[in-house]
Amino acid sequence: MKRIKFLSLVFVMLVTAMNLNAQNKNVDEVLGQNLDYNVISTAVPFMMIAPDARSSAMGDVGVSTSPDVYSMHWNPAKYAFIEDDFSVGLAYSPWLRSLVNDMNIAYLALSKRVSPKSTVAASLRYFSLGDITYTGENNTNLGTYSPNEWAIDVTYSRKLGNYISGAVAGRFIYSDLTQGVLDYSKPAVSVAADIAVYYTRNVYWFNNLDAVFSWGVSISNIGSKMNYNEASTKKDFIPTNLRLGPTLKLDIDDYNSLAFSVDFNKLLVPTPPIYQTNEDGAIVYENGEPVVVSGKNNDVGPIQGMIQSFFDAPGYYDPQLGRYTGKFKEEMKEFTLGIGAEYWYNKTFNVRTGFFHEAKEKGNRRYLTFGAGLKYNVFGLDVSYLVPVNNTATSGTNPLENTLRFSLTVNIDKWGNNTRLEKVN
């Protein structure tokens, strides 16, 4: 399959994501974002893809939903409250099949309770870009290769009180996009960490209804920048992300329960600024540095970038005022919103739905999600389906359409001699 156009788009997006001229006129072929605006691009965007069918069926929410084996991606602090002693989960998604037919993402997760208050967990995420045919000058065939990226995570989660828990996680990320075909390219690596908090307790807000209120906060992928080019010192940010939100679960009766969740997300990565250009459209440099007209220089370290990301949006040029305005408005548009609902019958069958919204200027992803699942004995099987409500690609279709995800879980209530979760009403 000839996919040279695809390769160039992916390579340019990932390898030069933080290029000075960040106003790309294309579609992000990993996340499906519209890049025609001032979108924040990072290396390894596959780290932001929801891996499991449960949360992806609920509008990509998960920071405060009830704990499961896939909590590593959403909020590792939830593991401290997981009820099962040992869990294994395997998730798979054929990714962006409207663009290519062999891109996919797989996810393996394990969790083990080590005490009534503590749980350890690990996960492996693997993203394959499929088979890509590389060509050189005069369309010389350089061979077919399979670029891939992967990450491995470990976490320790502990209850800090009757209703609250915390977690820290470590992560190693590896990205090999060119398989050594290009002389100046190399695989990129990063080491990152997560910190997270989770709170959950029974509440008595409704007559004759048992309810559980939860909230969570997680900052993920706090780590080193990545470099794909041996001939350059330019490095790209990884997708450091802030996720927070609440969940309310209602036990309607002994057989029926309903939960509602909301997630807010913000990339803690600098927004590309607006640079001064000359009459030819080239960026103007002063003392070796590009001249920033609005916003802030995004060539900074990871920690400074996290702090700066809350107040560095360049805004929009107002020709009547002759200056850039709306900086706070643009900053608020960098938050995405996920809303989800989950219904369970007899703790055996479930249906889920949700909605995800991203501002037009920041990627323009908007979609409905649906899903269902079954739980029998120690086994669980879930599936989700994504329906875009807008078209972002120039072809008039959305690269995310018809996205399916599948998850299989095995939950063992008792494994070894460890005691069960310490429960408090």
Q: Which sequence ranges carry the predicted segments?
A:
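Bacterial Sec-dependent N-terminal signal peptides
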Residues: 1-25
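Subset of outer-membrane beta-barrel
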Residues: 23-425
